[in-house]
């Protein structure tokens, strides 16, 4: 037995015994399958609105606000959707489309087409005003117009078309800024200014009305084809879905892929 002092081994040093060499194949431990998976993708979006016209379209108006504003109007007051409500409703329609609802599919097609048309209208006005602003003498330099304190808003949408609605509103905000700039410098009249603003605002409100008038119904293509109670009730309320919508021939660019069960 070796002596130790203060925990230090004082025994004569010996080489450790080495294992005998072997000619057998080494044992290979089964490798654990490595899980190659990245984390969830994440992105945030914020926007600045510079004009009261765009901010009012973002906020919408409740029935009581509409009644106060239109006190002399003979029309009954109605609720005007806000952009967050439009985004939320577009998300609901998108999820119904994912669940194979042909009526939701039809509305997505209608909504996408309307957004394309309204976007073109707004962009044409922006281009027209931009050309007017360029008509000033070359010795004059105008800076881009913007609010000294814009409204900063965080935006989240569960559907691509919800974001397309937001892009449209941002385009209208740019339109309004350029229109007010052109009017401020005497390049357009007040009547022309109001005409441009009304044209752009109407393009936005058309999108709002499409989404606002949507009524959800729990039904699938199979319900329609099999004439289930849910399918018959939906047909009674909203009519027979378009054949091209049912077959999937006509769909929104952002719709999910049709499942085979749904008749694709």
Regions found by a protein language model. Name each.
Residues 177-178, 191:
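Mid-to-C-terminal oligomerization/interaction "stalk" domains of large proteins
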Residues 193-196, 200:
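Extended, well-ordered alpha-helical scaffold segments
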């Amino acid at each position: 037995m070796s002596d130790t002092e203060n925990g230090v081994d004082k025994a004569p040093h010996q080489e450790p015994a080495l294992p005998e060499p072997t000619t057998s194949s080494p044992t290979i431990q089964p490798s654990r399958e490595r899980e190659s998976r990245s984390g969830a993708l994440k992105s945030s979006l914020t926007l600045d609105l510079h004009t009261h016209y765009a901010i009012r379209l973002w906020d919408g108006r409740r029935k009581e606000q509409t009644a106060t504003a239109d006190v002399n109007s003979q029309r009954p007051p109605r609720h005007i959707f806000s952009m967050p409500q439009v985004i939320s409703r577009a998300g609901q329609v998108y999820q119904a489309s994912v669940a194979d609802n042909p009526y939701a599919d039809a509305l997505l097609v209608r909504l996408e087409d309307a957004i394309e048309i309204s976007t073109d209208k707004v962009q044409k006005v922006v281009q027209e005003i931009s050309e007017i602003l360029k008509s000033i003498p070359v010795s004059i330099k105008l800076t881009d117009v913007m609010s000294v304190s814009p409204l900063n808003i965080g935006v989240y949408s569960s559907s691509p078309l919800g974001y397309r609605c937001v892009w449209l509103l941002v385009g209208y905000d740019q339109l309004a800024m350029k229109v007010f700039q052109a009017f401020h410098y005497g390049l357009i009249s007040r009547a022309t200014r109001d005409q441009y603003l009304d044209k752009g605002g109407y393009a936005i409100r058309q999108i709002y009305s499409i989404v606002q008038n949507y009524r959800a119904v729990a039904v699938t293509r199979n319900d329609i084809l099999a004439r289930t109670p849910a399918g018959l009730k939906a047909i009674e309320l909203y009519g027979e879905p378009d054949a091209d919508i049912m077959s999937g021939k006509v769909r929104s660019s952002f719709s999910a892929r049709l499942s085979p069960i749904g008749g694709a």
